[in-house]
Amino acid sequence: ALFYTDINSLGYPDFERGPGGMQSQKDKGFSLKARLFKEGECYGLDYAFCEYLPNVAVGLVDFAGTSLTASEYVVASKSFGRFDFTAGLGWGALGSTDNIGGNPLSILTDKFDQRGSGYSLGLMGGVPGVSTWFRGTTSVFGGVEYVIPKARFYPVNSKIKLEYDSIDHELADFCRECEGDRFESLDSPISLGYEVIVNKNLNFGLY
């Protein structure tokens, strides 16, 4: 996926405005996600527990250049009837709350203890920040959703979502160099959402 952001809380030199001219920070990013295992699949092996295996995926968010919103994650999801549960480990912005007190990958090497930002490492746009991936503080995130079936008195399929946010919006890299107003801390890491399912490609939501 490709995305482009305009961050008003970060300044950037604007030479067309003359000496000292500034504009808001413009930043593009790329994200990747790969599914490692499919829910209920044992890939040719016949084990009784196969039906209980979850989807497992690994992802990189804003993985190149300045990496202001960079995150990496490993996540699993499993459906039980109308419920769908998700839980994962996140690094970077997703790991900024440090809610497990360290990085489990540090048992392999202490290089995973520290994480630099794209700015601090001097990375240019489009250059993958491999030296930062899966490093630094780590946090657990997760959520659950429930599908509300269509009924005579309720003529749409919809979902209720509950999410635990592992991003510290004051400490995440995209705000460490903020100028002026900073992001306010959240009253709660718990978010609630509601989605109407129009078809398999289109949902409308309120969060």
Describe each region flagged by the PLM:
Residues 1-64, 80, 93, 148-158, ...:
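Transmembrane beta-barrel domains of Gram-negative outer membranes and organellar outer membranes
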